[in-house]
Amino acid sequence: MVMKATVDDDASGWELGVPEKMEKSSTSWVDITQDFEDACRELKLGELLHDKLFGLFEAMSAIEMMDPKMDAGMIGNQVNRKVLNFEQAIKDGTIKIKDLSLPELIGIMDTCFCCLITWLEGHSLAQTVFTCLYIHNPDFIEDPAMKAFALGILKICDIAREKVNKAAVFEEEDFQSMTYGFKMANSVTDLRVTGMLKDVEDDLQRRVKSTRSRQGEERDPEVELEHQQCLAAFSRVKFTRVLLTVLIAFTKKETSAVAEAQKLMVQAADLLSAIHTSLHHGIQAQNGTTKGDHPIMMGFEPLVNQRLLPPTFPRYAKIIKREEMVNYFSRLIDRIKTVCEVVNLPNLHCILDFFCEFSEQSPCVLSRSLLQTTFLVDNKKVFGTHLMQDMVKDALRSFVSPPVLSPKCCLYNNHQAKDCIDSFVTHCVRPFCSLVQIHGHNRARQRDKLGHILEEFATLQDEAEKVDAALHTMLLKQEPQRQHLACLGTWVLYHNLRIMIQYLLSGFELELYSMHEYYYIYWYLSEFLYAWLMSTLSRADGSQMAEERIMEEQQKGRSSKKTKKKKKVRPLSREITMSQAYQNMCAGMFKTMVAFDMDGKVRKPKFELDSEQVRYEHRFAPFNSVMTPPPVHYLQFKEMSDLNKYSPPPQSPELYVAASKHFQQAKMILENIPNPDREVSRILKVAKPNFVVMKLLAGGHKKESKVPPEFDFSVHKYFPVVKLV
């Protein structure tokens, strides 16, 4: 039945059906059912009537509001039980605020830990931590252990939220910082809360000792159970205190606080095995009393905050299991230990590499934020002690040894030269701080932000070249044997190329490319970006050697003693070697894909609304803002990669042979690297089987088969193992 009211309905009757409303309300109602059906018959099948006043916004609002499938606030009306808040539950006697048994304490603590982790993984506080009624107002709790624990959890949430907000490396899918008006225990100091937890911890430790078995004494099963339960509660309270103390340590500006956090993390890790083995001692959740599998047990009400959620599609918060909780904490501790290592790094290049490697593990938002705030402390100094400008100068010295930064050079104390280099270094600070911050974002967002930061680095590149030219002119007047050509420019170009390479490679990790696109991505990397990178690294190495020779000559002039020449390890040699290996891997993959295409093993889409050129230009669009290296446009790419320019043009067997040589070359380069790391061994695990597969294909193996090959990216994120099906 479709009804129309002549007066606005009374808001109090929104939950009633139409017949009840008609009886209850004094409103004049008109039955329009027949008129509505007649109007519908005038419409043809599939035709819709669209009123000008009923746009997309109104349509979405009409669908969402008060529809249980769309409005999160309506879920509470669908359960048969009464949803009580903390005060109502206390009056009703459904929740204990004093004399909680050990199993109850253990169970509540474990579920709280699970809720805390679920919040850190991107759900709202209202659907996770604040489903625990004890957290709503710890002042009502009389049990000392429960009160201290509730305050501890609130403080952990508050400091974690502050850290994540300050680091600003989260997006809406990573983290939700809204507190929904709940008090975050701001009236109690951090020191007071850690003191309360320590008192409870000491009390439980005394109970653990008093129930311990003595030699030669027959063990009472009840006393043994009490001992195990006391130990379980003690481990959880101590873990809460240690975790809170670690987060407090990270709020301090001194570097010594990081060392303190490192020691505490070792303690926290030691407690996890005791927590894991005692999970069964806590009271368990009773499932089936609400929708989904949110734990229902004393002290928890999953629907208590449902009305606080905005009228949006209900986001289901699946609380993680207790066994997973222990594993998560174990990984979090390892990540925080890794974060602590950043303060020992000597220069900016090492720090950037560290951030890249840390980000590759896809760490949680809390550990990413802690790394950011440890690197750049509130006073905007690196680790709270070093100026970013000094870090940039050190990075320049270690990479290209520019004469202007050498104390033995005439430009070192030249005011004009000093102003030039200081101005350039100051302009470097913002882009490099942004680059470090980008590595704190999740992997998908990183790629997008890397594309945008190229514009800033392009501007920096332009400035570097101008400063180089000015310094070179000054230097020639005083020291004609020295050059200042392309020193700063080489350094900025190196970072530009790294960003471009990372941007393209991350597309493989995020599974953005279709198989038919692989060939031009690998071509751009091997023929262009890695070629430029190796040339840039070689130029930087040459600048270093030239500066070292001048320094040695100056030393000889002062000292008459003959010094034995030691063979120096070139600082950039390892990176040059790795770039050669990467270039060979990319070249091997490019030739493999071209050969597969020749053999009809690559399925191409039937382009209707786009074309290969449109896709190509979309993939490399961010590079258009960069002047050096100049972007390769689609027609240039087709011309440069055209095999018909060779006489005779190579066929697929020859391309398979060429690809196998590239994989073999990469394998030989990597096998000669001293002290290989995990990255080297991962690439070797791809290069070796691909070399064998290319040899088989070159010999005509499965030549007639048109079944596309499989590309297995499980060993390495950027280079797949080619598998023939």
From Swiss-Prot:
Q: What is the designated name of this protein?
A: N-alpha-acetyltransferase 35, NatC auxiliary subunit
Q: Which Pfam families match?
A: Mak10
The record's function comment reads: Auxillary component of the N-terminal acetyltransferase C (NatC) complex which catalyzes acetylation of N-terminal methionine residues. N-terminal acetylation protects proteins from ubiquitination and degradation by the N-end rule pathway. Involved in regulation of apoptosis and proliferation of smooth muscle cells.
Q: Where is this region: Disordered?
A: 548-573
Instruction: Provide ranges: composition bias, Basic residues.
Output: 558-571
Organism source for this protein? Mus musculus
Q: Which domain of life is it from?
A: Eukaryota
Point out residues bearing the modification Phosphoserine.
S187
The major lineage groups are: Eukaryota, Metazoa, Chordata, Craniata, Vertebrata
Which compartment or compartments is the protein found in?
Answer: Cytoplasm
GO-annotated cellular components: cytoplasm; cytosol; NatC complex; nucleoplasm; plasma membrane
